[in-house]
Amino acid sequence: MKTNNLGYPRIGSNRELKKASELYWAGKISADELLDAGKEIRLKNWYLQSEAGVDLIPSNDFSFYDQVLDLTLAVGAIPQRYHELAKSNSSLDLYFAMARGSQKNGQDVVAMEMTKWFDTNYHYIVPEFTKNQKFELFSEKILNEFKEANAVGIKTKPVLIGPVSYLLLGKEKEEGFNRIDLIDALLPVYFEILEKLQIENAEYIQLDEPFLALNLTDKERNVFTKVYNEINVRFPKLKIVLANYFDCFGENLETALALPVDTFHLDLVRCQLQLDDILESGKLASNVNLSLGVVDGRNIWKNDFKKSLELIKKAADALGENRILLAPSCSLIHSPCDLDLETNDQTLTPEIKQWLAFAKQKINEVVLLKQFASGEVNPKNSADYERNVIANENRKTSKLIHNNEVKARTAGITAADDKRKSAFASRRKSQIKALNLPLFPTTTIGSFPQTTEVRSWRAKFKKGELTTEQYNDLIEKETEAAIRFQEETGIDVLVHGEFERNDMVEYFGEQLDGFTFTKNGWVQSYGSRCVKPPVIYGDVSRPNPMTVKWSKYAQSLTSKWVKGMLTGPVTILQWSFVRNDQPRSETCTQIALAVRDEVVDLEKAGIKIIQIDEPAIREGLPLRKEEWAKYLDWAVKAFRISASGVNDDTQIHPHMCYSEFNDIIQNIADMDADVITIECSRSQMELLDAFANFKYPNEIGPGVYDIHSPRVPSSKEMVRLLEKASAVIPVDQLWVNPDCGLKTRHWNETKKALIEMVAAAQEMRKAVENPVTE
């Protein structure tokens, strides 16, 4: 029996990668210094896993931005718009330009599209493919990192995304072909990579093929068969670990089991039943091993050793111990680094802390499970086992978790609780009369730049270095400055800027019962952006208003409307580490009731427009389409519960991003929002087609510029996007806004971009009022 790890967090236990990357982008450190910071993180990760006793330690799981972008560079799939830039820049700067866009030395290129990695809160950079796409080995990162580990005496298992999933992760940038047909052009580059690794004596290679958990066409399944047979013919001595995670193989199981690989990795956290399916199928070849993903790589709860050992015993009895590998369910990039860094009992109480395990602890759990399953019992690990059993039993019975009032309120929800008082057509008349907004009303999506100064105020306040009065005074001044800037710029519906908020989920979690927090529980969201998800450990309720004070203050400063800003129940759920002792739908409904109470209180305080951010509704979709309807039913209902306690003339704005809407457009309509704002600019308004084809009746604010890039777009660019939008959506339904909140941007670029955005809206109004006649 061996231990296997699929990937380890690359941000560094103290977010060293974030700090180094941002210093490099700001021109404050050299490329060599950034590369050294990356190397130091890799070495620490390898040593940690080696010392813990991991047999198959991954390499190439490190990335300066994103593992999919790494592979795009490795196989030379560099979009045409970066070719000129590639001539005059290092491959590192080319890489970051592809991720972030670039406006340097007279060059102006937009970033590649970014979207969610399956149903996680990680984002990847979407590969772009053309009909005659050429591939060539461009970067040897995979080989270099394998050699780097070898140089310090650590034999690793290189990890790369498998060729079929890589193509399926991408997007066709022109019509007339299917990206899966590029497989014959792509495979030779994979062969070249595998050849180089074989020459360097690599024994195991992990190929991640998570699309095997999705609904595939017969053609796509046939491509899997072709690819892995070819790899086996060319590299019969390489031990290929084929990793599937996040769900079952489903109808792809027969195809998968026929592939000539050394080991199949199974996610037994998300899909425990597949172990029985495989063992009972009789189709697992006698020379093929199973990697059992029994430790949850995506959540932070301590493993239940008793349950895991039952699964391991079942597999070992059927196949023999020598054919079993033990592993986390997926890469640990979705877990925080180290629970040992949580030393503040006020932030995370000892009772809750004993229920948790982060990446370092999960590695130890995998190693301990191997020892127990192999009969390697000693006094130390016996004590570890006993502690695990006690912690899990304690969690089941803890009074911290259960609130009977919350359970009763949730059970008492009626059909009327998730419906507005009137239909949209009637509400719209009330809102037009009450709000009196122009055509193409302009707004932003909530947050404004959080400067180092603003963040330092919050840190000082938390440390007790600022009094509540001093802190509030500073936030008031910053809020007033934001209101005045928006008024001067000519924005129609203002926001208060969210300067008091650390994170759009954490801020609410800090004020809700049933949530707790970590001090250092950071995980990578994209690039250098890390998030510290709250921990939902028990029943959720709202003891006090959460946002009313600041929204009310901002509204008192201006005669224009100020939006209330809330995070929706599904997003709070999706972006938290969620308790695993009850259905997610039940936890979501509890959160929805808490948000509903806040919406009602905002309305009472005179706030007539309330944004409820739900960027995560689509990412919560199960990977398999046959399970979508059940999820969408409770997710949409939770949103409606949160939004339906107000009068007709109060306008509800959900904000959604990273979304393809075609296949869930009916469910979006079922949310019954007054105005939906969506991320649109990177896709050049393609996303609007779904709304147009559906004849979506409500109002829409398609994002007109990409806030994930520092690039400042011109008003002409935004006018072009608005013209595209107005070609498919009636002009009296269109709003004008950025893609997303502006928290991570700098004030300089934000001000310039919003001035351009308002100019674009004004130009569109003129065009409608004075149409050009042929």
Curated annotation (Swiss-Prot):
Cofactor: Zn(2+)
Entry keyword Metal-binding: yes
Protein family: Belongs to the vitamin-B12 independent methionine synthase family.
Cofactor: binding comment: Binds 1 zinc ion per subunit.
Residues that hold Zn(2+) according to the record: H655, C657, E679, C740
GO biological process: methionine biosynthetic process; methylation
Name of the molecule in the record: 5-methyltetrahydropteroyltriglutamate--homocysteine methyltransferase
Pathway(s) this gene product operates in, as recorded in its UniProt entry: Amino-acid biosynthesis; L-methionine biosynthesis via de novo pathway; L-methionine from L-homocysteine (MetE route): step 1/1
Molecular function, one GO term: zinc ion binding
Described purpose of this protein according to its UniProt entry: Catalyzes the transfer of a methyl group from 5-methyltetrahydrofolate to homocysteine resulting in methionine formation.
Catalytic reaction equation(s): 5-methyltetrahydropteroyltri-L-glutamate + L-homocysteine = tetrahydropteroyltri-L-glutamate + L-methionine
Highest taxon of the lineage: Bacteria
Binding locations of 5-methyltetrahydropteroyltri-L-glutamate: R15, E16, L17, K18, K116, R529, C530, W575, E619
Keywords annotated in UniProt: Amino-acid biosynthesis, Metal-binding, Methionine biosynthesis, Methyltransferase, Repeat, Transferase, Zinc
